[in-house]
Regions:
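Long, compositionally biased stretches
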Residues: 1-66, 84-139
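Short beta-strand-centered segments at strand-helix junctions
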Residues: 66-75
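Short active-site loop/helix that positions an aromatic residue
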Residues: 75-83
């Protein structure tokens, strides 16, 4: 299937690589299908909406940021997780242009069942998880 993206142009992808968010992502509820695309280099990836070429999020594994989640098993119930090894956790990362910093959204991890490709965003009420990842200096 061909999908259009504003960052990567037209891509030919099989539907077996799609990640299904049955409830969408908060703020983007109408978009249910996404695909993970590699970034040029480093630990980051793009979570690209299949049905809207302009919607894509920078994501990475939280362990890259030195953070690990300890989640009760029932938090994975919405994605029908049978095997703990099938759980992948990603966090969205945004670039704050004003402060030249990267901000991981640790209060909203994305939980993905790698076996059935279902995912959802878990919202955690924990203000202490708000943090700046690093200052980015101009060369």
């Amino acid at each position: 299937m061909q999908i259009e993206t504003s960052r990567f142009g037209t891509l030919e992808l099989g539907e077996d690589v799609f990640i299904h968010f049955p409830w969408g992502i908060p703020g983007f509820g109408a978009l249910k299908r996404y695909v993970l695309l590699e970034h040029r280099s480093g630990p980051f990836q793009w979570l690209q909406a299949v049905d809207d070429p302009t919607v894509a999020f920078v994501v990475c594994a939280p362990h890259v940021l030195g953070y690990r989640y300890s989640l009760p098993s029932e938090k994975a119930d919405p994605i029908e997780l049978d095997q703990p090894d099938d759980l992948a956790v990603l966090v969205m990362v945004c670039f704050d242009r004003e402060n030249k910093s990267l901000r991981p959204h640790l209060r909203g991890p994305l939980l993905l069942n790698a076996s059935n490709r279902k995912a959802y965003q878990l919202v955690i009420d924990a203000p202490e998880l708000d943090q700046v990842l690093e200052k980015v200096e101009k060369p």
